[in-house]
Amino acid sequence: MRYVSTRGAAPSREFDDVLLAGLAEDGGLFVPETWPVFSPAEWRALRGLPYAELAARVMAPFMTGGAIGFDDLQAITRASYRGFDHAAVVPLVQLEPSLFVLELFHGPTLAFKDLALQVAGRLFDHVLSARDERVTIVGATSGDTGSAAIEACRDRLRVDIAILHPEGRTSEVQRRQMTTVKARNVLNIALSGTFDDCQDLVKAMFADAPFRTELRLSAVNSINWARIAGQIPYFAAAALALGAPDRPVAVAVPTGNFGNILAAWAARQMGLPIERFIVGSNANDILARFLAANDMRTAGVVETVSPSMDIQVSSNFERLLFEALGRDAPETAHTMVDFRASGTMKVSREVWQSVRRDFAGLALDDAATLAEIARIRAESGYIADPHTAIGIAAARAAAPVGVPVIAAATAHPAKFPAAMHRAIGIRPGLPPRLDDLYDRQEHFVRAGNSLGEVETLVRHFAHRNDA
């Protein structure tokens, strides 16, 4: 399996190189040169498998030709999911006759990011050991990616990891899950700015060729294709449980950076009959506006009770745009560069309508989100975190008639105690292993929204660990 850049000016790569590079040299995102497709019989053969084995079989086609054989991958997925809190790893819960919640929060940091990142951390170890190399991972987080990435990479011998988070713009639980990790190879940076500022600085570090080479930069944000590959299996597992490939399904996902719903779309590229992809947004509604009216204009980031979606620039949308443009890399590059410069994405009506055929969207403000949390609990007894509640509302608003819809539950409600208390008057408890989270000492450094300042911090950190 080889990968190409969405912007067309970088050489094609095999999976191992894509894993370690994260972002293509031309600023584009890697995508498979051709999509692997399973036959209906091959999909049916995966029904009923333990999740770790299903995950390995779904991911395997993306990793051919490198250091990771199938037996290696299966050992990695088994180790990755052994510590999850639920035997099914990703259980389905039925809320309504045709509405099913896919719980993705049973991992070590209580968020869907664990499912891909626990695998990615071990993939890094495997490939770097085979090459006798070391990398510095830099990433930006709006809340959940940071803690999941740190948990996946802490104390690994060949990886240093530096994570930027927007100071004061995550929940306290999200912040503490990052900053209370004490490991020599972990650096937490609290940035004065928004998530988009953090993400821009990460992209700028990758664009700084001497810095990128000096520190051997890599990424575990969803710009890294390994993250997307690690998220496809749970949508496949849910679809198979509901009758696919012999029955169509729909998927609803609370969406910030567009990676999770892109993984569901990738599952369809692989042959699963997923009929509609439903985007749930908060007041930062750029994706919902685009889907409704071809209006993708950035605005100031609004702080909400669903902070993981407090994003204006959804990096993974570039991968879908590349496909919608018929894999026209120069046009993709032009569109993305213009979007970055002007704050407005301009696509033709034909391209917009091609996206609209598959995608729908709904945006909820904070009041509607809190009301939806209360409604879900009153009607079903289910306690959904703010992001999940938005996804459920989107599912109910836009699901195709007669088609079961899978709503992704992306985080445990205990990660957002203040919002949950406002909505339903309770603060859901953390699992026992996190009982002392509020008593643990925090470890982080503050930085201004300055590339030079952040690069200095990361360089000092990485070189200290090289010594």
Give names to the regions the model predicted.
Residues 1-467:
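PLP-dependent amino-acid enzyme catalytic core
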